[in-house]
Amino acid sequence: MVTVYSRHGCHLCENAVNTLESLREELEFTIDVIYIDGNPELEKLYGNEVPVIHINGEHHDFYKVDPERFRTSLEKHRRHQ
């Protein structure tokens, strides 16, 4: 499970989700996009760092998705399940 913490109207967030969508079929994972707008707790945690990407609930990266780095991280998470 990949979670993207996002904001409405965030072009970096849209780019990150598009990159993940392009990898989803090949790597077989689900994507959950959570908008932090209006959620004080999430806004405090992630604020201006969006998009923030988590893999299986653990922080992976923010601002952008590097496909090779994401692949490597996803594989590590799968080995440790």
Model-inferred region functions:
Residues 47-53:
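Structural micro-motif
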Residues 55-81:
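Non-catalytic, surface beta->alpha helical segment in thiol-disulfide oxidoreductase systems
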Residues 24-28:
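Short helix-capping segments at alpha-helix termini
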Residues 1-22:
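Local sequence-structure signature of Cys/Sec-based thiol-disulfide redox active-site neighborhoods
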Residues 29-40:
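Thiol-based oxidoreductase modules, predominantly thioredoxin-like and allied folds used
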Residues 40-47:
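N-terminal beta-loop-helix "entrance" segment that forms/cooperates
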